[in-house]
């Protein structure tokens, strides 16, 4: 079941909390190992608009958010470094591996035909300036080294329209929330609303991969021309 958060509350950049709305299904029932996705997807989907041209940046292969966007936005682009993003067959195979053969078999064809796909590096996006109303980047930034991450933010600034938004989540401590303001200062972006970097007692966390991991969300805005 999907809950709808208060509009003002969803704008705050902060740690994701256990009390936040979540969904266990987005196109497919979500994989149990994707511990933060129920919260991330439920939050991020609130920013989709029917008139938007959007990008799911580093979208993954089986990951369902890009498919969901095709039914809720005017034009949807998705890019990933993995060349399988260009292959319908490879996408279906990955869906079968993660969600089961029936999910792959019954994937509506329009999820693929409505999706403009590209193999791309976030530090060098193949899109024209000011193309997107919103860029979604879900649990990706923590995997980038500092130099690549800064170049990716500059690319996001370039491809966003003025007042366009970057809707991002990332794992902590692999990426530190207190660095966001520094990153904003050198990339032509700004935090849209309130930024709270203090970790609450009820922050969602996982020890699935060893040391505890938390998840942070950020609403970032392009204030002018790239």
Regions found by a protein language model. Name each.
Residues 51, 132-133:
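Local beta-strand N-terminus motif with an aromatic residue
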Residues 136:
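A conserved beta-strand element that flanks and buttresses the S-adenosyl-L-methionine
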């Amino acid at each position: 079941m999907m809950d709808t958060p208060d509009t003002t509350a969803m704008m705050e950049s902060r740690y994701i909390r256990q009390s936040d709305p979540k969904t266990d299904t987005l196109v497919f029932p979500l994989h149990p190992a994707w511990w933060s996705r129920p919260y991330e997807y439920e939050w991020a989907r609130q920013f989709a608009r029917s008139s938007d041209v959007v990008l799911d940046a580093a979208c993954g292969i089986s990951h369902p958010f890009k498919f969901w966007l095709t039914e809720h936005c005017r034009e949807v682009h998705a890019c990933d470094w993995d060349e399988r993003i260009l292959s319908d067959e490879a996408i279906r195979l990955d869906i079968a591996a993660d969600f089961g053969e029936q999910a792959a078999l019954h994937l509506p064809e329009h999820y693929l035909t409505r999706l403009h796909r590209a193999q791309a590096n976030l530090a060098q996006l193949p899109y024209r300036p000011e193309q997107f109303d919103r860029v979604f980047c879900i649990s990706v930034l923590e995997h980038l080294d500092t130099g690549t991450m800064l170049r990716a933010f500059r690319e996001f600034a370039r491809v966003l329209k003025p007042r366009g938004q970057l809707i991002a989540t990332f794992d902590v401590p692999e990426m530190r929330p207190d660095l966001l303001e520094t990153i904003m200062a050198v990339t032509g972006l700004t935090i849209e609303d309130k930024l709270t970097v203090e970790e609450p007692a009820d922050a969602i966390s996982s020890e699935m991969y060893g040391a505890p991991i938390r998840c942070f969300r950020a609403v970032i805005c392009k204030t002018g021309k790239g």
